[in-house]
């Protein structure tokens, strides 16, 4: 975005990246929305100009929940990329039942749910870097899973209540997060949302072939609104 004269500031969700906490664990989804709210407010205080929240995957779902919770009062618009609203591969019913039980009994119990880099990007170098990144853990706790599922249901059910414009980005060939979830989101908020599905792209539209088009779409949308 720097090439378009726009600055970016990044936050690692707790339990991920360089942020503290057990890998892939939160006590409650609201911890992520509180973190997102605090981060955006901090950046707003630093830059003194409009800050447009952008969330990718889990971050996309988090931004949506944060907006719906009224925790981004100064935000006039926002962007979500491949928002984690619907997984591509259906989870068996017995796993859902087990996850719900474990969330109550052993909330910190976690399983590996690795995603290979080839599922994220068609650029071999990007995939290789991802596969060897020590900050990538692929862990998901039972509590995070149930909190996430509840959050996605709430987002889709209440998306029509979003009053500010937002842009939804998705890859047509995303094999991790089903792009139909983005379509459902847009269908629930047709007056405030704009959906762009990029043909042939995978889960990481910013790190895939033709990423320049994605950045251009964002820049044009920000300048237009």
Language model regions located:
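Alpha/beta-hydrolase-fold enzymes
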Residues: 54-141
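Active-site nucleophile elbow and catalytic-triad environment of alpha/beta-hydrolase enzymes
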Residues: 140-158
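Short alpha-helix in the alpha/beta-hydrolase fold that links the catalytic acid
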Residues: 164, 178-187
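Short beta-strand/loop motif that positions the catalytic acidic residue
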Residues: 162, 168-170, 174
